[in-house]
Amino acid sequence: MLEGVIRESITKANAKALKKDGYLIANVYGKGVENVNGAFKLNPFIKYLKEKKHLIFPVKLGDKTFEVVVQEYQKNPVTNELIHVDLLAVTKGVKSKFKVPVKHQGTPVGLKNKGILMLSKKRISVECAPEHLPDHYLVDVTPLDVNESILVRDLEKHENVKILDHDSIAVIGVIKAK
């Protein structure tokens, strides 16, 4: 479980001092949860996110424990370093909006016909309760030939999960190389 500290002062000077000490500034919020301003050690936070298996993960700020999902993050445009993260605290049985990653498997037929695999949509917007949240959408791209794509409507449907993206949006496809 990730452990962080609660920020008592939310001034710019305080945030700069924490960043200088290797902390990542974070906000935890959600339906029925009081907003908490916190900070996590940057390197352990990134390492934990890379190794986690599920979208929802536990964090501890002070004496409070939250089940959270990364809602938004900000990076420094020059150094590409993570500088801020918003964590959505989820509550069992309460519907929320999430962005679920798309993963693909297989080698498309179209690659042998001088095609290039294009991932158009990296995340799918869904609305559901946290206990029904899929960890990812897995797409088999093996049958795709040049100028073919998989649309949102072709994705696997999960029970109690409403996909918010339009049905006709391409998720992944094979385009002709120029």
Curated annotation (Swiss-Prot):
The keyword Translocase does not apply. Keywords: Ribonucleoprotein, Ribosomal protein, RNA-binding, rRNA-binding. InterPro entries: Rbsml_bL25/Gln-tRNA_synth_N, Ribosomal_bL25/Gln-tRNA_synth, Ribosomal_bL25_b-dom, Ribosomal_bL25_C, Ribosomal_bL25_long, Ribosomal_L25_dom, Ribosomal_uL5_bac-type. It comes from the Bacteria. GO terms for molecular function: 5S rRNA binding; structural constituent of ribosome. One of its GO terms (biological process) is translation. The keyword Iron-sulfur does not apply. GO terms for cellular component: cytosolic large ribosomal subunit. Gene3D superfamilies: Ribosomal protein L25, beta domain, Ribosomal Protein L25, Chain P. It holds the Pfam family Ribosomal_L25p. NCBIfam families: bL25_bact_ctc, PRK05618.1-4. Part of the 50S ribosomal subunit; part of the 5S rRNA/L5/L18/L25 subcomplex. Contacts the 5S rRNA. Binds to the 5S rRNA independently of L5 and L18. This is one of the proteins that binds to the 5S RNA in the ribosome where it forms part of the central protuberance. Belongs to the bacterial ribosomal protein bL25 family. CTC subfamily. This is Large ribosomal subunit protein bL25.
